[in-house]
UniProtKB/Swiss-Prot annotation:
Entry text on domains: Both FN1 and one of the kringle domains are required for binding to fibrin. Both FN1 and EGF-like domains are important for binding to LRP1.
Domain of life: Eukaryota
Enzyme Commission number(s) of this protein: 3.4.21.68
Keyword Repeat: yes
Organism: Homo sapiens (Human)
GO biological process: blood coagulation; fibrinolysis; negative regulation of fibrinolysis; negative regulation of plasminogen activation; negative regulation of proteolysis; plasminogen activation; platelet-derived growth factor receptor signaling pathway; prevention of polyspermy
Ranges where the Kringle domain occurs: 127-208, 215-296
Location relative to the cell: Secreted, Extracellular space
UniProt subunit comment: Heterodimer of chain A and chain B held by a disulfide bond. Forms a heterodimer with SERPINA5. Binds to fibrin with high affinity. This interaction leads to an increase in the catalytic efficiency of the enzyme between 100-fold and 1000-fold, due to an increase in affinity for plasminogen. Similarly, binding to heparin increases the activation of plasminogen. Binds to annexin A2, cytokeratin-8, fibronectin and laminin. Binds to mannose receptor and the low-density lipoprotein receptor-related protein (LRP1); these proteins are involved in TPA clearance.
Disulfide bonds: 41-71, 69-78, 86-97, 91-108, 110-119, 127-208, 148-190, 179-203, 215-296, 236-278, 267-291, 299-430, 342-358, 350-419, 444-519, 476-492, 509-537
Protein name as catalogued: Tissue-type plasminogen activator
């Protein structure tokens, strides 16, 4: 690792995307999907790609000449062409525009700090503001660590957002693979190639408000806090220390300011390592160590995809939209193999919340299995995580008649202090603050693998989601639920849309028990209820009943303590 730190070199893009020389071209074949290949030309410095027979202009370094190039069998063929000043402004941020004399191609010569076809890329931007809609920086890594795909890639031609859109420049898209937020999502994202297909994923781009916090997001590349101790307790050396002469990452690095290095000894991650680190002296020997900087919570954040298929009782969903959803399976004494039992909710790396009534058969813990990251109920997912159960705790005052105190905790089994590993399909939900009171009729979401309707003999083959509204307490009473007991430990939610007997109203159903009812609070999905019971499924003016999580925060914390 120490040798890697000496050898790595981080290069920021400080010049226009078209400043290349023939020796910088890479002739490559790009894998497309899982079957075919397509010959392209790629610029090594800027990652700009060009399809077969595509043409472009480029300035020649240290020269006033401009070349006309085209991509031929993976090789750029170029020759000089006469140019003139553009008849209309086409370059942003003070770029100088030149147009070919005999055809319409143009090239922008960008001032320092900007790049791109139209100088629209801000190479000095290290974080994003608000939702990142105006972010034009050069971050190109997804939260999973996957490298973003160039927006101009032919593999994205059929995607709703690509560099080929007429409004691509306005949206920040183009011949690059940098994170953007063209659809006004919650933060910048990009397309990545995973599991044999291209899909969207949030980027690990830091928010500007995160940079100076006392914790780090992702791998901590954007961490700008003041921690200066390593995991062993050693003090970090200043990045401008004379002892570091000859090292790559010091205050003398040409990109030091952008990398967060300077006349200080604060922990940083300039080379994209797993987490922030620093140089230290141990036994009079210069080495490096990871820092004792805590990771920031990412609970309740997700890569939400709009469901495409409406089915009875809700909508088919992808697990990345509900990464805290767990599937609990059990071995029954009287039947071979495992059977789906209930839903669950990931609230920390090693703990799952569920409903107490799911465990009335008093299964031995080793008969239970918890699966995270699975979209299809019985089909293994490529990124799923599977765990045995160390123990489970059912609330001592659970009433199996009224379902009061319908809550349980499952501890996942692990050889270390961590169990579930965070990814785009596995992430904790936020527990609510004790005083959380959302307005009546707030729209919330539930998810699960339960039945489409009450009389169906089968559970859903795929994860579903449903959209319901929180009922006021005056409508969550016994008289609204056929005189069934309703306690202060319960809350109600249902689909309030109008419609006749055939209306497809959203609701939880058998098999969804133990799953989450989540609502947006302070920009994060927050757990307000655990799916508990109801009268049928999807009946008009009949809400579902959920365990009120705010009543059990102390119980949860007490039982999670070692």
């Amino acid at each position: 690792m120490d040798a890697m730190k000496r050898g790595l070199c981080c290069v920021l893009l400080l010049c226009g995307a078209v400043f290349v020389s023939p020796s910088q071209e890479i002739h490559a074949r790009f894998r497309r999907g899982a079957r075919s290949y397509q010959v392209i030309c790629r610029d090594e410095k800027t990652q700009m790609i060009y399809q077969q027979h595509q043409s472009w202009l480029r300035p020649v370094l240290r020269s006033n000449r401009v070349e006309y190039c085209w991509c031929n069998s993976g090789r750029a063929q170029c020759h000089s062409v006469p140019v003139k000043s553009c008849s209309e402004p086409r370059c942003f941020n003070g770029g100088t525009c030149q147009q070919a004399l005999y055809f319409s191609d143009f090239v922008c010569q960008c001032p320092e700090g900007f790049a791109g076809k139209c100088c629209e890329i801000d190479t000095r931007a290290t974080c994003y503001e608000d939702q990142g809609i105006s972010y034009r920086g050069t971050w190109s890594t997804a939260e999973s660590g996957a490298e973003c795909t160039n927006w101009n890639s032919s593999a994205l031609a059929q995607k709703p957002y690509s560099g080929r859109r007429p409004d691509a420049i306005r949206l920040g898209l183009g011949n690059h693979n940098y994170c953007r937020n063209p659809d006004r999502d919650s933060k910048p994202w990009c397309y990545v190639f995973k599991a044999g297909k291209y899909s969207s994923e949030f980027c690990s781009t830091p928010a500007c408000s995160e940079g100076n916090s006392d914790c780090y997001f992702g791998n901590g590349s954007a961490y700008r806090g003041t921690h200066s101790l390593t995991e062993s307790g050693a003090s970090c050396l200043p990045w401008n220390s004379m002892i570091l002469i000859g090292k790559v990452y010091t205050a003398q690095n040409p990109s030091a300011q952008a990398l967060g290095l300077g006349k200080h000894n604060y922990c940083r991650n300039p080379d994209g390592d797993a987490k922030p680190w620093c140089h230290v002296l141990k036994n009079r020997r210069l080495t490096w160590e990871y820092c004792d900087v805590p990771s920031c919570s990412t609970c309740g954040l997700r890569q939400y995809s709009q469901p495409q298929f409406r089915i009875k009782g809700g909508l088919f969903a992808d697990i990345a939209s509900h990464p805290w959803q767990a599937a609990i399976f059990a071995k029954h004494r009287r039947s071979p193999g495992e059977r789906f039992l209930c839903g669950g909710i990931l609230i920390s790396s090693c703990w799952i919340l569920s409903a107490a009534h799911c465990f009335q058969e008093r299964f031995p813990p080793h008969h239970l299995t918890v699966i995270l990251g699975r979209t299809y109920r019985v089909v293994p997912g490529e990124e799923e995580q599977k765990f045995e159960v160390e123990k489970y705790i059912v609330h001592k005052e659970f009433d199996d008649d009224t379902y009061d105190n319908d809550i349980a905790l499952l501890q996942l089994k692990s050889d270390s202090s961590r169990c579930a590993q965070e990814s785009s399909v596995v992430r904790t939900v936020c527990l609510p603050p004790a005083d959380l009171q959302l307005p009546d009729w707030t729209e919330c979401e539930l998810s699960g693998y339960g039945k489409h309707e009450a009389l169906s003999p089968f559970y859903s083959e795929r994860l579903k989601e449903a959209h319901v509204r929180l009922y006021p307490s005056s409508r969550c009473t016994s008289q609204h639920l056929l005189n069934r007991t309703v306690t202060d430990n319960m809350l109600c939610a249902g689909d309030t849309r109008s419609g006749g007997p055939q209306a497809n109203l959203h609701d939880a159903c058998q098999g969804d028990s133990g799953g989450p009812l989540v609502c947006l609070n302070d920009g994060r999905m927050t757990l307000v209820g655990i799916i508990s019971w109801g009268l049928g499924c999807g009946q008009k003016d009949v809400p579902g009943v959920y365990t009120k999580v705010t009543n059990y925060l102390d119980w949860i914390r007490d039982n999670m303590r070692p």
